[in-house]
């Protein structure tokens, strides 16, 4: 292709609205343009990269026996109502009505629709197992779209679904996807980690996320350098570090003391000259319309994901100030578990074994000393705290680290959540009706591109891996008016094409510096510069990564790039 014929609208400055590196460079390099909040047009270069990513995904999905389909993005409400997710998805789902006032939605994922297809067609164990997939546009009504292609309202996703007769079959399908995802992300040139994850609204018994460490990410991954343990922050477990000072010994009786105007854990710690870890934190939640008291160590945070997993199907929220006042007779900041009999109390495991701690007295401006779980109040104990950097690994005792990350893929063992609720049945070998077991597996196509840019860039632009760059090589004559340079450049370009390289000839009538800056900006892995060294039969080969430059013979230029690019 000739650059002079292409639409590549590069920018010299970072757009003001772009905060993360990938967003800045995608705009500056002319890959994307914003239509509305969270909605982008993919221009020529972006489309080339995204198609390459999709091709890699297709090849690896086909290799595990998955069959590509294409399902409707416009879904009737009743299908989502069957699974119960019409209400669960809330404001995240785009909803609309047709001219007959029937409810519809734009699909965010396709578990329900795939199950409908299976329900209508699968009859016998002889038709299983099945793996079906699609690469399709999805829609999610994000409250605050941001970070370019990382949090959008319209996006491309590869979603696949497995149907098996039993748990062993699901385990095999899950393992196939796990390995296929590793091959996909390896081929795309990403550095990633597969971590244990929470299934959330998807449901199911097990899931893994594939994460790329990046400050642009909105997820957090907990890792242990000692044993390799890794998990999403929502799922991670740990041993908290010991309290900052030992608890007072003895069987002491709770006693109130005046804490005027001290409402926060930090304020009480300063007032008492005791560390936050010597206090109990009281949180009031409303679960299915009823109050619940949650107790944590003062320096710990509640994991709402863990609480939700413990609560099961209960819907919960934080209590409002007026509700707290009605139930406790005091305001938040003065609450505690002693004397509470009218609601369930849940305590985090970190409070087990602790003695004589400080808690609210359920009286404004007062707290209690000497509060002990199991003696002064009873509670149901669970792992409810959010892991923090510096905690200890439960497997090996090493210190845990927490890193912001970008989620690029997620796989789930769904179990029977959808097949059971939506009435999918087949006959087994004995002629008995049984319910198939399902898995669900997703990859964010644009997220792969954004993650690659976050990983690989410098002050001059993107440094894209060859497998997903829009072009493998750009051939750049330094002086368009030099006939010898143009002839050699066209010859090298033609040889690159013949070797199967995606080549671009920069035939624009621009200064060499402009051409070089644009090539660096858009992330082409190799540049062949045809300049003054042509008189000696040589051209410059510049590798975008590290800017390493070597002189090669004109006749060897195309073959050298092909060898380095793995063609």
Question: What is each of the regions a protein language model found here?
Answer:
Residues 268, 439-468:
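C-terminal, non-catalytic macromolecule-binding modules
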Residues 87-105, 212-223:
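Acidic, His- and aromatic-enriched active-site or binding-groove loops in soluble protein domains
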């Amino acid at each position: 292709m000739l650059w002079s014929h292409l639409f590549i609208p590069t920018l010299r400055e970072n757009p003001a609205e772009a905060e993360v590196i990938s967003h800045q460079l995608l705009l500056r390099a002319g890959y994307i343009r914003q239509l509305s909040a969270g909605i982008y047009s993919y221009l020529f270069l972006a489309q080339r990269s995204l198609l390459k990513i999709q091709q890699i995904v297709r090849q690896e999905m086909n290799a595990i026996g998955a069959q590509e389909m294409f399902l409707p993005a416009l879904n009737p409400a009743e299908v989502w109502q069957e699974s119960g997710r019409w209400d669960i998805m809330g404001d995240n789902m785009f909803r609309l009505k047709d001219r007959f006032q029937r409810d519809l939605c734009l699909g965010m994922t396709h578990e329900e629709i795939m199950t409908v297809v299976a329900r209508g067609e699968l009859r016998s164990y002889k038709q299983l197992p099945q793996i079906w997939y699609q690469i399709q546009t999805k829609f999610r009504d994000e409250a605050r779209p941001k970070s370019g292609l990382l949090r959008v309202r319209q996006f491309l996703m590869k979603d696949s679904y497995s149907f098996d007769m039993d748990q062993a079959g699901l385990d095999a399908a899950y393992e196939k996807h796990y390995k296929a995802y590793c091959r996909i992300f390896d081929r795309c040139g990403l550095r990633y980690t597969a971590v244990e994850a929470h299934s959330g609204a998807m449901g199911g018994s097990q899931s893994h996320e594939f994460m790329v460490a990046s400050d642009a990410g909105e997820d957090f991954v907990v890792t242990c350098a000692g044993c390799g343990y890794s998990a999403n922050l929502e799922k991670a477990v740990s041993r908290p570090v010991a309290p900052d000072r030992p608890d007072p010994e003895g069987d002491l009786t709770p006693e109130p003391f005046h804490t005027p105007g001290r409402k926060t854990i930090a304020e009480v710690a300063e007032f008492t000259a005791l560390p936050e870890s010597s206090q109990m934190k009281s949180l009031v939640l409303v679960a299915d319309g009823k109050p619940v008291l949650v107790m944590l160590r003062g320096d710990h945070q509640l994991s709402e994901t863990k609480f939700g997993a413990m609560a099961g199907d209960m819907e919960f929220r934080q209590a409002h100030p007026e509700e707290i006042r009605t139930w406790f007779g005091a305001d938040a900041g003065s609450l505690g578990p002693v004397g509470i009999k009218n609601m369930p109390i849940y305590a985090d495991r970190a409070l087990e074994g602790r003695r004589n701690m400080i808690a609210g007295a359920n009286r404004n401006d007062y707290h209690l000393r000497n509060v002990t779980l199991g003696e002064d109040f009873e509670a149901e104990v669970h792992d409810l705290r959010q892991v923090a950097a510096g905690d200890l690994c439960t497997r090996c005792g090493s210190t845990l680290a927490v890193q912001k990350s970008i989620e690029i893929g997620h796989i789930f063992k769904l179990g029977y959540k959808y097949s059971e609720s939506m009435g999918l049945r087949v006959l087994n070998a004995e002629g008995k009706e049984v319910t198939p077991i399902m898995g669900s597996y997703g990859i964010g196509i644009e997220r792969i591109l954004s993650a690659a840019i976050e990983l690989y860039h410098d002050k001059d632009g993107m440094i894209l891996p060859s497998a997903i760059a829009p072009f493998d090589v750009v051939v750049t004559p330094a002086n368009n008016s030099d006939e010898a340079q143009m002839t050699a450049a066209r010859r090298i370009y033609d040889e690159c094409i013949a070797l199967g390289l995606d080549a671009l000839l920069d035939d624009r009538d621009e200064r060499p510096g402009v051409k070089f800056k644009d090539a660096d900006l858009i992330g082409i892995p190799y540049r062949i510069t045809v300049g003054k060294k042509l008189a000696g039969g040589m051209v410059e080969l510049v590798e975008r990564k590290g800017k390493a430059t070597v002189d090669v013979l004109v006749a060897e230029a195309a073959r050298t790039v092909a060898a380095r690019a793995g063609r």
